[in-house]
């Protein structure tokens, strides 16, 4: 199977005194309409100083995407001025309506802001267990997905107002056995 080549993403990350909330919504387009949609909502809970937090997450979408519920622990590192950092999460993953619903997932995220905040290199990497079939019917047990992103942060330029919080950028997808695909792909 092939996936649409155009995807739009809306995302939000918001830290607070009890941890942080992150969500995103992806919509893939075919012809002139949305062909599929997917979203994740994740919460880090932390009532202590250590860099470990409790992670809870919901993932879901339309078409071939099954609802998933995840819980685990996250280690987070940020440097003092928050120009670079990473996190690593180890989670139990329950995939609703899957013949083998009890699974695991490892997720790593990173960010690097440079050029006086004008540019950012961000992304994530997921590795999980999920019994599924590719579009050609081949059975798979493990999936890998990484999406490095490069952003131009428009509010960091002198001509933009500080409240103009808009970034434009690009994303690459490196995957193995993801969605209906069979084997390794770079999109």
Task: Go through each PLM region and give its residues.
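Gram-negative (and chloroplast) outer-membrane scaffold detector with strong preference
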Residues: 40-96
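Residues that define the transmembrane beta-barrel architecture of outer-membrane proteins
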Residues: 4-8, 35-39, 65-71, 100-106, ...
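Signature for the C-terminal beta-barrel architecture of outer-membrane proteins
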Residues: 3, 29-35, 47, 51-52, ...
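Short glycine/proline- and aromatic-enriched beta-strand/turn motifs that initiate or cap beta-hairpins
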Residues: 1-30
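Outer-membrane beta-barrel transmembrane domain signature
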Residues: 98-179
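Short loop/turn motifs that connect adjacent beta-strands in outer-membrane beta-barrel proteins
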Residues: 18-20, 44-54, 78-87, 113-121, ...
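Transmembrane beta-strands of outer-membrane beta-barrel pores
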Residues: 27-31, 58-62, 77, 90-96, ...
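Residues on the lipid-exposed face of transmembrane beta-strands in outer-membrane beta-barrel proteins
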Residues: 10-14, 41-45, 71-77, 90-92, ...
């Amino acid at each position: 199977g092939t996936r649409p080549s155009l995807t739009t993403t809306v995302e939000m990350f918001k830290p607070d005194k009890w941890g942080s909330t992150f969500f995103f919504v992806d919509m893939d387009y075919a012809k002139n309409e949305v062909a599929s949609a997917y979203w994740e909502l994740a919460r880090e809970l932390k009532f202590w100083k250590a860099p470990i937090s409790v992670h809870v997450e919901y993932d879901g979408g339309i078409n071939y995407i099954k609802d998933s519920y995840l819980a685990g622990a996250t280690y987070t590192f940020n440097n003092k001025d928050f120009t670079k950092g990473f996190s690593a999460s180890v989670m139990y993953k329950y995939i609703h309506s899957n013949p083998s619903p009890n699974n695991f997932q490892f997720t790593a995220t990173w960010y690097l802001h440079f050029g006086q905040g004008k540019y950012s290199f961000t992304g994530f990497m997921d590795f999980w267990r999920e019994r599924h079939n590719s579009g050609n019917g081949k059975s798979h047990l493990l999936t890998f997905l990484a999406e490095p992103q490069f952003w131009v942060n428009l509010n960091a330029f002198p001509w933009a107002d500080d409240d103009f919080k808009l970034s434009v950028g690009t994303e690459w997808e490196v995957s193995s056995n993801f969605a209906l695909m069979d084997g390794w792909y770079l999109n």
